């Protein structure tokens, strides 16, 4: 994601982000304010194309309190744990599963330590990037687990927050895969991409070869690139 950050910094400019629709929904207003805080001073076509917003709902685990905080977080890549997973939906279900007993959070209302956290998509970009977390934190151990992922019709609709009135479908098709073989410090990267002619091609250093769709899913798949089937011209924050 380093390249996206460089492109964003190079192309960024200041804009004025305004609420384009009146709404009594406080969450919508908060989401726009969060977007303004993050990008109003530095906006670019990269933000419009690759960035979305995640809603973290944090609830105090003290039953007599139940204080709820909603925190919006911009994202340009979903980093998914693949341990003991066989397909991408299992990874997504785990990522968006409710977390309980988070002990490093302190309630502002009752000062209780501990909460439950629920993560949901709030807005999704037209182009979604998904990273399969193959490396441990120290980078010394690689997980070569085979994770099946859809070439067509990846459905992210059910991972969207029910707190937002949204009847849209979020269906995506794969258009590129980045692969990695070896270990982090001495590995090799290459990519497969779908061309405008509808065929898939493998790009490995100076070699370009035509491949079949069946060759796309391997133990070396590292980063997946999806585009939305029905492109929205504007991002709904």
Q: Across the structure, where does each feature detected by a protein language model lie?
A:
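Papain-like cysteine protease catalytic cores
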Residues: 1-74, 111
């Amino acid at each position: 994601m380093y390249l996206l950050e460089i492109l964003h910094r190079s192309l960024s400019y200041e804009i004025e982000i305004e609420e384009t629709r009146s709404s009594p929904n406080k969450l919508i207003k908060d989401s726009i304010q969060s977007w303004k805080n993050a990008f109003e001073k530095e906006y670019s076509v990269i933000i419009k194309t690759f960035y979305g917003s995640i809603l973290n709902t944090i609830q105090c685990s003290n039953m007599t309190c139940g204080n709820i905080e909603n925190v919006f977080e911009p994202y340009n890549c979903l980093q998914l744990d693949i341990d003991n997973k066989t397909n991408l939906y299992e990874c997504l279900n785990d990522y968006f599963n409710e977390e309980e007993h988070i002990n490093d959070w302190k309630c502002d209302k009752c000062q209780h330590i501990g909460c439950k956290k629920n993560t949901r998509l709030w807005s999704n970009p037209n182009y979604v990037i998904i990273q399969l977390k193959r490396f441990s934190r120290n980078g010394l151990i690689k997980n070569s687990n085979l994770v099946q992922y859809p070439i067509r019709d990846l459905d992210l609709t059910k991972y969207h927050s029910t707190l937002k009135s949204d009847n849209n479908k979020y269906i995506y098709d794969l258009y590129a895969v980045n692969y990695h073989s070896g270990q982090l410090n001495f590995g090799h990267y290459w990519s497969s991409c779908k061309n405008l002619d509808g065929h898939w091609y493998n790009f490995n250093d100076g070699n370009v070869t035509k491949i079949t769709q069946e060759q796309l899913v391997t133990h070396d798949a590292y980063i997946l690139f999806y585009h939305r089937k029905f492109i929205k011209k504007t991002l709904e924050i």
